[in-house]
Amino acid sequence: LALPDALEEEYTIPEIAVEFELQKSYPSFEEFENYSDLDCDWDDYDDELEKLGVDADRDAENHKLLGYADTIQGEMLTECECVSRGLYCGDAESYENTPDEVKADIEKHAGDWMLLLQLSPVTKGGFEWMFGDCGMLYFYIRKDDLAARKFDKIHFSLQCC
């Protein structure tokens, strides 16, 4: 697809160099708590991350390809599975009213999803790219779909403060 000829400059995104760097990635406490068999409270989890050298005040510009998301409003694996089944996720009440056997199956398959790409705000020169109020864009994919390169099966989510 080509861009329209009359596209105003304010609606374009400049070319920005990207550098890749291998980093360790850890799940959020909520994701760890939901999908781990270990019994752990927030303080213990936070202490362990600190021992591993994880900075709780991560850099605001933290794009990721794979790994675990730096969530703002909570883990999204359950949301991905719900939406893939056509369930509404606009409020907590919808999930609470889902039958228990369906919730159990959703929770069983939520772990099939993984972060594909996380995009955070960018400030370069005079250019600023923001998503809501300091938000991030998240693209999730099922592990099997990634292996099969089915990128049309991606789930997108925006979280912001």
Regions flagged by a language model, labelled:
Residues 1-161:
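Preference for intrinsically disordered or flexible, low-complexity segments
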